[in-house]
Amino acid sequence: MRQLGEPAEKARRRYADARPALYGLHHDGTDAELDRFAGDVERIVTEMVTVFGEFPSFETGRYTFIADYLPTASGDAMEHRNSTVLSSPGALRTRHTGLLGAVSHEFFHVWNVERIRPRSLEPFDFEDVNPSGELWLAEGFTNYYGALILQRAGLADLENTLARF
């Protein structure tokens, strides 16, 4: 049974700095909205590589973004060593910049926390909370650079970027 606004599943393969990143996106918007969003994600990825000088080594040889932007989705985001999963009830056409902010934040974690992290976070316990007095520092750097990357990539103006702090 089809419902109003039933989405078409879309996937695009993009390349940033000759390094493949696969985007899978589930939304109920247009192909033009998807292409704009994927292009902006590519700008974020490219700017992050500029900050760190290179891509980290991905065990799978690529990085995958999986996003679910539907009215029925809950808002959440989580990075992993080789991928990021994002969800939001916001549509690409109305929440574009906010959704990109989550992408930028989570992708910065590819370096900061996934590969550079306080010792108190190790070893990871995937069955319980990992309390750490230093996590605020890792998240603080990620919040700062996530917003700065959007501005450097031309996706947010300086006034709005400074207002976030």
Where are these regions (language model features)?
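Extended, low-hydrophobicity, Ser/Thr/Pro/Gly-biased non-transmembrane segments
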Residues: 1-9
